[in-house]
């Protein structure tokens, strides 16, 4: 059986213009066949259908939605443990005013505390309708907002550190919409190898259908400013048991295993956060 598997590898590599086989290639091919038992030959066929064409456009142009000009900002605030309750109360008193004020072209998408992952952490997701001009308009107005400046001064005493990123949403994900609760949310963050964002998007565009039956898919984003080649997938579940059952169900669907097989090599690092919504969060 081994020589036959090796000859397949040689043929495939000649067609693709790659180098000759190595010992690890034979093991990888065998693992791929075992990985998709119910789909004989899928490993060989996938060598041809998953090739990504070279592009001249930026991946932000190719992967983001054309019909909207939304820009997103995600904030991670690491709070001093003794101040977490006070931080939440202060946040819930001030941020909704910006969300409801039509003079500010920004809106809250979601606000959470991290439950499992980094402790004593708050995560905020904002939407700027109108892209970078809306972001700058909002930032300029906040410089003259006395209440917001006081909020920032008070908040700074409660924080250990903070960071943010500007994001675009993938074209094949639905735009995040308010949800009734109670739900828990999972933010899965993937740090990709440079140059692999388009391949990631191509694979997930085919695979997202396997993760929508229970309405668990909330939003998918990729970074534009801040740490680059970072992807965030946001999911909603009723509870941890529901999360377990939903994720296991995906593995029983033909095609999901191939998506995992082809996207795992693109990842340098991945992280999962389980988050609980704050009272003000539109995503409950």
Curated annotation (Swiss-Prot):
Keywords: Acetylation, Autophagy, Mitochondrion, Phosphoprotein, Transit peptide, Ubl conjugation. The modification Phosphoserine is found at residue 129. The modification N6-acetyllysine is found at residues 65-66, 73, 80, 143, 146, 191, 193, 279. In response to mitochondrial stress, the precursor protein is ubiquitinated by the SIFI complex in the cytoplasm before mitochondrial import, leading to its degradation. Within the SIFI complex, UBR4 initiates ubiquitin chain that are further elongated or branched by KCMF1. Residues 1-35 form a transit peptide. The modification N6-succinyllysine is found at residues 146, 193. Gene3D superfamilies: 3.30.70.100. The keyword Membrane does not apply. Its main location: mitochondrion. Ubiquitous. Highest expression in liver. Pfam families: NIPSNAP (PF07978). Belongs to the NipSnap family. This is Protein NipSnap homolog 1. It comes from Homo sapiens (Human). The lineage of its organism: Eukaryota, Metazoa, Chordata, Craniata, Vertebrata.
């Amino acid at each position: 059986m081994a020589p036959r598997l090796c000859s397949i590898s040689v043929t495939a590599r000649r067609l693709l213009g790659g180098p000759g086989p190595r010992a690890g290639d034979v093991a990888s091919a065998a693992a791929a066949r075992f990985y998709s038992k119910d789909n004989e030959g899928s490993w060989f066929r996938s060598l041809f259908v998953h090739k990504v064409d070279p592009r001249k456009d930026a991946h932000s142009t190719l992967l983001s939605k054309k019909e909207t000009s939304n820009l997103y900002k995600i904030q991670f605030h690491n709070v001093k443990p003794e101040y977490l309750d006070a931080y939440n109360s202060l946040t819930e008193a001030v941020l909704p005013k910006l969300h409801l004020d039509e003079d500010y072209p920004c809106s809250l998408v979601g606000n959470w505390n991290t439950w499992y992952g980094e402790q004593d952490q708050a995560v905020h997701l904002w939407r700027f309708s109108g892209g970078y001009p809306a972001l700058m308009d909002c930032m300029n107005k906040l410089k003259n907002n006395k209440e917001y400046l006081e909020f920032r001064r008070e908040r700074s005493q409660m924080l250990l550190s903070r960071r943010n990123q500007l994001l675009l949403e993938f074209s094949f994900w639905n735009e995040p919409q308010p949800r009734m609760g109670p739900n828990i949310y999972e933010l899965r963050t993937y740090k990709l190898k440079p140059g692999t964002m388009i391949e990631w998007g191509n694979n997930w565009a085919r695979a997202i259908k396997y993760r929508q039956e229970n309405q668990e898919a909330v939003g998918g984003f990729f970074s534009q400013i801040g740490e680059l080649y970072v992807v965030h997938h946001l999911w909603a579940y009723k509870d941890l048991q529901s999360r377990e059952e939903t994720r296991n169900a995906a593995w029983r669907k033909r095609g999901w295993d191939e998506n995992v097989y082809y996207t795992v090599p693109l990842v340098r690092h991945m992280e999962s956060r389980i988050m609980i919504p704050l009272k003000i969060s539109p995503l409950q």
